[in-house]
Amino acid sequence: MKVCIDAGHAKNTAGKRSPDGTLREYEFNRYVAKRLKYHLERHGVQTLYSCDIETDVDISLSERCALANSSGADVFVSIHANAHGNGAEWTSGNGWEIFIYKGSTKGKAIAEAIRKESISLLGLKDRGVKTDSLYVTGNTNMPAVLIEHGFYTHKEECAKLKDSAFREKCAIADAKGILAYLGIAWLDEKAESVNAPAKPSEDKYAELKSGFETMCKAMVSLGIYKNIKVE
């Protein structure tokens, strides 16, 4: 399975920042996109970005969709944070929501799966699954969703959007929802290490050392080696 991750906007995108200028949306989007990529890939899901997420230039929506359509991706997910008002002052608009293309049953299924995880993990107001004429959901060949992870024009939510722990929760919620849609069980990172080779314990090391010393002493006593020093 393959997921195309779209991190919305870039450094040169006009506006798209909190009223106090401490948060630019593209920075939040890219952080979550990278963590989403990590979590999907550790579950064996192939991923790609819809554009170079290190560039300062905002890649056009048509280019993003063209890349996704040529990639053979099974799911397209666009990462965003929301805004309300004129952007110059804090407003009361708040909450989490997700957009799909009208009539997309698969898009609806993905959105509901992500919504379930997000509302549980993030503690934000549930604004629900919505349909709108968004370019990226309407011009991609695969099921597509656009996620708004909270409002950077809302003072309290902006503080959350700047917090790395909250961003990680966003990525985990998105990943859990996508994986649920794909029929892949979520694995906590600690669970992944259960089957990792264990380091020899100190007792085992002492046991091996003692055995080696005994062997060396026996070889010396038999005259096989004369220059072995066993302390």
Q: What positions do the PLM features span?
A:
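Catalytic-core regions of hydrolytic enzymes
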Residues: 1-96, 100-108
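Active-site-adjacent mobile loop/cap segments within catalytic or ligand-binding domains
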Residues: 4, 10-17, 71, 75-78, ...
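Short, charged, low-complexity patches
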Residues: 25, 29, 107, 111, ...
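Extracytoplasmic/secreted envelope proteins and their assembly/folding machinery
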Residues: 33, 37, 61-65, 73, ...
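Sec-exported extracytoplasmic/periplasmic mature domains
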Residues: 34-45, 69-73, 115-123, 175, ...
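Short Gly/Pro-enriched loop/turn and capping motifs at secondary-structure junctions
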Residues: 104-106, 134-136, 151-154, 200, ...
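Active-site-adjacent substrate-binding region
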Residues: 106-130
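Short, low-complexity, charged amphipathic interaction modules
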Residues: 196-231
